[in-house]
Amino acid sequence: MKQKVVNIGDIKVANDLPFVLFGGMNVLESRDLAMRICEHYVTVTQKLGIPYVFKASFDKANRSSIHSYRGPGLEEGMKIFQELKQTFGVKVITDVHEASQAQPVADVVDVIQLPAFLARQTDLVEAMAKTGAVINVKKPQFVSPGQMGNIVDKFHEGGNDKVILCDRGANFGYDNLVVDMLGFSVMKKVSGNSPVIFDVTHALQCRDPFGAASGGRRGQVTELARAGMAVGLAGLFLESHPDPANAKCDGPSALPLAKLEQFLTQIKAIDDLVKSFDELDTEN
């Protein structure tokens, strides 16, 4: 079955093409740390031959506590992204939380992301669609894979068909997430075989029911990423940090930066193997 291709500049994103890495840090903590992390990702992905898009948030607008670090904000965040693009020649993805942010962010970065908690907000979807930018839609934890077709339809109605879908797990009882591996194929089907990627980092979140910050299970990141990529996906969404224990957001889920090359070597081997197989139709 023909898979839809979404182009991010010269990077082609599709379920049957070599996977694209959307990787970086959870939130921009400083200009220097962003430069350090981006440089390491660029070095490793170039060595392994993996198409790469840098990711980070300029504002974490949905933190559990009002006292938690949110990021440098729109103006300073865009300056950092511009410097990363100029220095390393990378494409950049970041999330927007308000309709008024869509165009200013799209003027700087290459992919704008619709956060999971906001994925059904029509005004935000319409504003993002109007930019003409490539869109990454995070599947909400409370929405089934089949319902993602409705969100994609909103973007199409807004004149934008450059849509990527991203799964980050589903609520399983209280304060826990699980990843339904069967959901990836459902998301492909209801979106006209749009590219589907896997956010392995946020799928590892495990909240403290009485705390103000997310816990995580980064010790299982390799196993979960290998399982997801074995389905046959367009990309992997990954967050890393040189010192996860002291990261300002979601450190418990972040891959230690020093392990990146070893981790990606395994993921690429699985992706190469899976995409070497002929398509097998088991419905007929």
Curated annotation (Swiss-Prot):
One of its GO terms (biological process) is keto-3-deoxy-D-manno-octulosonic acid biosynthetic process. Pathway: Carbohydrate biosynthesis; 3-deoxy-D-manno-octulosonate biosynthesis; 3-deoxy-D-manno-octulosonate from D-ribulose 5-phosphate: step 2/3; Bacterial outer membrane biogenesis; lipopolysaccharide biosynthesis. It is found in: Cytoplasm. One of its GO terms (molecular function) is 3-deoxy-8-phosphooctulonate synthase activity. It comes from the Bacteria. It catalyses: D-arabinose 5-phosphate + phosphoenolpyruvate + H2O = 3-deoxy-alpha-D-manno-2-octulosonate-8-phosphate + phosphate. This is 2-dehydro-3-deoxyphosphooctonate aldolase. It comes from Salmonella typhimurium (strain LT2 / SGSC1412 / ATCC 700720). The gene is kdsA.
